[in-house]
Regions:
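Long, low-complexity, charged/polar intrinsically disordered regions in eukaryotic proteins
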Residues: 1-9, 91-109
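A short, conserved structural fragment
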Residues: 58-69
C-alpha cells in the first residue's frame, strides 16, 4: 500500500520535472537543458533519486542526455508537432500528464 503512495509522489515529481523540460524546450529552443544539480533543485529530490528518475524517462524516450561544454544535461525530446511557443500552457500541461501517465515507476518506489 505504501508503494502506491510512493509511486504517486514520484509520478508527481516526474510530472514537474518533465513539464519544466518541455516548457524550456518550447520557449528557449532546442539547446535548452538542465543538469542533474538543477533538476535536484527543481524537484527537491536527492542526486541519486533524480538520476534514477531521469534514466527511467530516458528509457521511455521522453528525455535525452547530451553534453554541453563538458556538463551532462538533459532535455525533452519527441514533443508533438502541434506544441510550439504559441501553444497555451494548458495544452502543454495536458501533453505532459499523458506522457508521464505512460511511464512505469514500479521499480523506483
Amino acid at each position: 500500500m505504501f508503494g502506491f503512495f510512493k509511486r504517486k509522489a514520484l509520478k508527481k515529481r516526474a510530472f514537474n520535472l518533465y513539464k519544466e523540460l518541455v516548457f524550456g524546450r518550447l520557449y528557449e529552443g532546442n539547446r535548452f537543458g538542465l543538469n542533474a544539480e538543477d533538476l535536484c533543485k527543481t524537484t527537491g529530490l536527492n542526486l541519486f533519486s533524480i538520476l534514477n528518475l531521469i534514466h527511467r524517462l530516458i528509457a521511455t524516450g521522453l528525455v535525452e542526455e547530451y553534453e554541453l561544454v563538458d556538463v551532462v544535461c538533459y532535455r525533452a525530446v519527441k514533443e508533438p508537432i502541434y506544441l510550439d511557443d504559441t501553444s497555451p500552457p494548458s495544452i502543454i500541461t495536458d501533453y505532459v500528464k499523458r506522457a508521464i501517465g505512460r511511464v512505469d515507476f514500479k521499480g523506483l518506489a
